[in-house]
């Protein structure tokens, strides 16, 4: 069973590989700010869960048709993440000054990482069904110093990740505690994805296709 990953996120790819799955990576072209603005114009402000679920769905739907002229035959997964603290929603900071401001505000405190999941059953080259769910993990930060923040930002790592932090790389020592599925903080909740796969009446182990992994 093939799993198509509608994302270029190295973290999501690494998670799936570690779980025994070698996905087919299909970059998804979604104008996220425009999509959120359009949804809010129609429905009003989106909750964090609603926003990440919307973007996860749009990413999956954007690549469900064909890949290099070949029909997609398998499951298509789209994911999105955002970090919320004090009622403010934080995506990727992109710029060092924004990442620095966020870290100075969140150090020593706790926020919530929201992760949206959307899975399309596209076996046989046609859409048979689609399911989605969100996962939330509480993240407590260490009371990091200004020097640590500056060094972390200089590495470039926090600029292109939701909330300006990672748990599986340089940012790991700055995370004091995680409540919830730890993989949620990395990029997708593996337990949530397994639940969605089973909702489609597919066994999770049918997705195992990495070298050295067999039933």
Swiss-Prot record:
EC number(s) on file: 3.6.1.9
Pfam families in alphabetical order: Maf (PF02545)
A cellular-component GO term for this protein: cytoplasm
Entry's Gene Ontology molecular function annotations: nucleoside triphosphate diphosphatase activity
GO annotation (BP), single: nucleotide metabolic process
Cellular localization per UniProt: Cytoplasm
Catalytic site positions: 80
Domain of life: Bacteria
Main location: cytoplasm
Family of the protein in this entry: Belongs to the Maf family.
UniProt-recorded name of the protein: Nucleoside triphosphate pyrophosphatase
Species: Leifsonia xyli subsp. xyli (strain CTCB07)
Source species taxonomy: Bacteria, Bacillati, Actinomycetota, Actinomycetes, Micrococcales
């Amino acid at each position: 069973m093939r799993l198509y990953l509608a994302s270029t996120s190295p973290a999501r790819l690494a998670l799936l590989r570690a779980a025994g799955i070698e996905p087919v990576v299909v970059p998804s072209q979604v104008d996220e700010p425009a999509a959120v603005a359009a949804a809010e114009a129609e429905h009003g402000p989106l909750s964090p869960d609603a926003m990440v679920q919307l973007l996860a769905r749009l990413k999956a739907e954007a690549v469900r048709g064909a890949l290099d002229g070949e029909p997609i035959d398998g499951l298509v997964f789209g994911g999105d993440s955002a970090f919320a603290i004090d009622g403010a929603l934080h995506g990727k900071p992109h710029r060092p000054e924004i990442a620095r401001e966020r870290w100075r505000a969140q150090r020593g405190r706790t926020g919530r990482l929201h992760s949206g999941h959307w899975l399309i059953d596209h076996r046989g080259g046609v859409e048979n069904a689609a399911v989605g769910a969100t996962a939330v993990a509480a993240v407590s930060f260490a009371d990091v110093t200004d020097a640590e923040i500056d060094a972390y930002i200089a590495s470039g790592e926090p600029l292109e990740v939701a909330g300006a932090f990672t748990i599986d790389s340089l940012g790991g020592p700055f995370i004091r505690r995680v409540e919830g599925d730890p993989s949620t903080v990395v990029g997708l909740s593996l337990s949530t994805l397994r639940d969605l796969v089973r909702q489609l009446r597919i066994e999770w182990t049918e997705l195992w296709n990495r070298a050295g992994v067999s039933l």
